[in-house]
Amino acid sequence: MPRKGVTIYDLLLSCPGDVTDYLEIIKESVESFNRTFGNLNNIEVVTKHWSTNSYPESGDKPQELLNKQFVRDCDAAVAVFWTRFGTPTDKYGSGTEEEIEEMLLAKKQVFMYFLNSPINPSELNQDQYQKVLEFREKYKDKGIYAIVDDKFDFQRQFTNHLSLYFL
């Protein structure tokens, strides 16, 4: 039987390429949230990511096309950073930064996380990591991010934050 009166929230998943395995954790957490709390409260959170919610299109810069296709329609975003900041766009230092700024300018919720996990020094791109640190410094007084130590800590914190925000 269809559920009547369900409120659906679109959650943008935004992150550079070094944390793509965290996307699965986010999706699992959202699915668990929907099963546990969503049914009881008539809400559903739907994840959106460029890899599944965009289509080939021409006529503008790639990030602007993504923004038009689905980013601006999202109700909230979750962003995760570790050692890479991402690929620059025409407006910002990375697509992830542009998506965060789009959300903040629209006064929408951004769940932002920075990983504090060790990395093999030979795998570290110092320029990219410096951009992550500068970005974190830029937002340190806005209170919009959390530091996480590993995947378990991230899942625990994100699930808690999801519940606190949507319930």
Regions found by a protein language model. Name each.
Residues 80, 113-115, 148:
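Generic beta-sheet signal
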Residues 66, 96-99, 131, 135:
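A general structural detector for well-ordered alpha-helical segments in enzyme core domains, enriched
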